[in-house]
Amino acid sequence: MATIKEIKEQLAAISDLLDPHWTEFEADARSGVQAAVRQRKKIIQADLDEEVRLENMLRYEKDLYLQGYQAIAGIDEVGRGPLAGPVVAACVILPKNCKIRHLNDSKKIPKKKHEEIYKQVVKVALAIGIGRISSEMIDQVNIYEATKMAMLQAIDDLQGLVSRPDYLLIDAMNLGISIPQSSIIKGDAHSLSIAAASIVAKVTRDRMMIGYDEIYPGYGFAQNVGYGTKQHLEGLETLGVTPIHRRTFEPIKSMLKEKN
């Protein structure tokens, strides 16, 4: 009789829930074998579910491929809501029908997985561009216009095997340029190209905020990335406003008025 270790090795070779060998393993009454069978089936089902999810997230891209477009760029931004730091956008062109496991809207990816998936995107992407708009410029033009500026900058910054996209998939934004484009609500959850841009923008901005935390300690920028957490608000009260704070955002706007 095969040991449980040997059976686990045999189960690892099965990748189909309809494989006829399941019957043999399911007939083994040992609890360890039954646990191994359940675990392996769970893994296979998770893989199948992930494949379906990735296929669904490629539906916009596949439709565009059929129309003749090749260099399809996903565009997304992070940093609209924080009280400090830049708004950062990324433009990413992935290879045709490229699938990256667990790539999703960056807000849905566990933080500990951000760097890993970011590296996978960077490794396979045909081209990546980054746009960064400072808090000073955000105050001058407003966050909506600053977001558009960051996205346009990301397109112009494209570096890699492709220098110019022939179609843009954008997360909930219309850019007034001649390149054909689609604005997709919650695009980072529905398009793999936009999801790739989302994680690139997120990791890029997080790294910037970690750097700012060293320059301006006491606000917790490495942890809150500029959002208005308790530590951040307490830092504003005790240390004041830094050059990277957005002066048109509350409560900073009111704090500056009171001082004047």
Curated annotation (Swiss-Prot):
Endonuclease that specifically degrades the RNA of RNA-DNA hybrids. Belongs to the RNase HII family. Signal peptide: none annotated. This is Ribonuclease HII. Keywords: Cytoplasm, Endonuclease, Hydrolase, Manganese, Metal-binding, Nuclease. The keyword Transmembrane does not apply. Its main location: cytoplasm.
